[in-house]
């Protein structure tokens, strides 16, 4: 028996894959499945926005995870018979003041230096 602590998107996904591989799985969570961080993130996958200085080694994993999402949702939809809606419309970071603008411009330059596909827009 394999025990998984946490019934968010990661714990449930790992449990699903292990069960599909014939393993016996039990998943524990202090609350309802999918109601903590997975619920709060609203299913957002924003590897371009989420990458931070000092986490450069994590970026390939973020990008690979994002690239697998379409295949993952198709398999989950097939196995669960529950329709899954997915949209890839990009992510918008908004500056509400000049300090925000400086932070976004700095982040933009950093993320472009990593080779991420980003565009800096102005409100004009």
Annotate the PLM regions.
Residues 1-27:
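N-terminal Rossmann-like FAD-binding beta1-loop-alpha1 element of flavoenzymes
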Residues 19-41:
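Glycine-rich FAD pyrophosphate-binding loop
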Residues 3, 27, 39, 80, ...:
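A generic, residue-level signal for flexible/boundary positions that often mark functional hotspots
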Residues 44-124:
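Dinucleotide-binding Rossmann-like beta1-alpha1 core, especially the glycine-rich loop
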Residues 4-9, 32, 40-44, 88:
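Short glycine/serine/threonine-biased micro-segments
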Residues 12, 35, 101:
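Loop/helix-junction capping segments adjacent to catalytic residues or to phosphate/diphosphate-binding pockets
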Residues 4, 30-32, 79, 104:
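Hydrophobic alpha-helical segments and their boundary regions
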């Amino acid at each position: 028996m394999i025990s998984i602590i946490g019934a968010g998107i990661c714990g449930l996904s790992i449990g699903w894959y292990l069960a599909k591989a014939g393993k016996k799985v039990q998943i524990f969570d202090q609350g309802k499945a999918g109601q903590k961080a997975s619920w709060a993130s609203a299913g957002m996958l924003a590897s371009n926005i989420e990458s931070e200085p000092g986490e450069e080694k994590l970026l390939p994993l973020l990008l690979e995870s994002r690239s697998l999402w379409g295949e993952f949702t198709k398999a989950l939809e097939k196995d669960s018979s529950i329709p899954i809606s997915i949209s890839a419309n990009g992510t918008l970071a908004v500056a509400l003041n000049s300090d925000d603008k400086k932070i976004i411009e700095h982040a933009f330059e950093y993320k472009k230096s990593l080779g991420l596909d980003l565009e800096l827009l102005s409100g004009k």
